[in-house]
Amino acid sequence: KTAFYSGATPLAAGAIIGGGNDEQIEALRAFGLHTGLAFQIQDDLLNLVGTKEAANKDFRTDITEGKRTLVAVHALSDERYHDEVEAILSSGTDNPAQLARAVEIFQETGSIDYAHTYALDLTAKAKAAIENVELDPHARELFLSMADFFVERLN
């Protein structure tokens, strides 16, 4: 839902207010939706594998809060670790060892890589959405740069 109200809707509204045609409005809506989702996935990754300093007070709180992020759902789909991940997510723990164990499982199951690849795919879809639509060249370049920034924040 965040991608819809923070990305898709504002860009579509801006296109409407700016006098955009239906093709431009839809392209910017799609761009906003895809980049908004990519941004959220990357934000979830930063919460897990960034540094405590970079994530500030929210480091690994998604685990403590039991959030079913894309990373967590992917890890839960692995039968080898399902019960352990479910137990950690359901516990409300803020124990650093337990949080580290969850991240270790997320890495072992390929869930972190899966989520990052998914975010990159969403970014590619976002860029494709505006590729053949008439836009101001400076605006297009800004949109493309923003899309890249959203998924490169971890690097």
What spans do the regions from the language model cover?
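All-alpha prenyltransferase/terpene-synthase fold signal
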Residues: 1-155
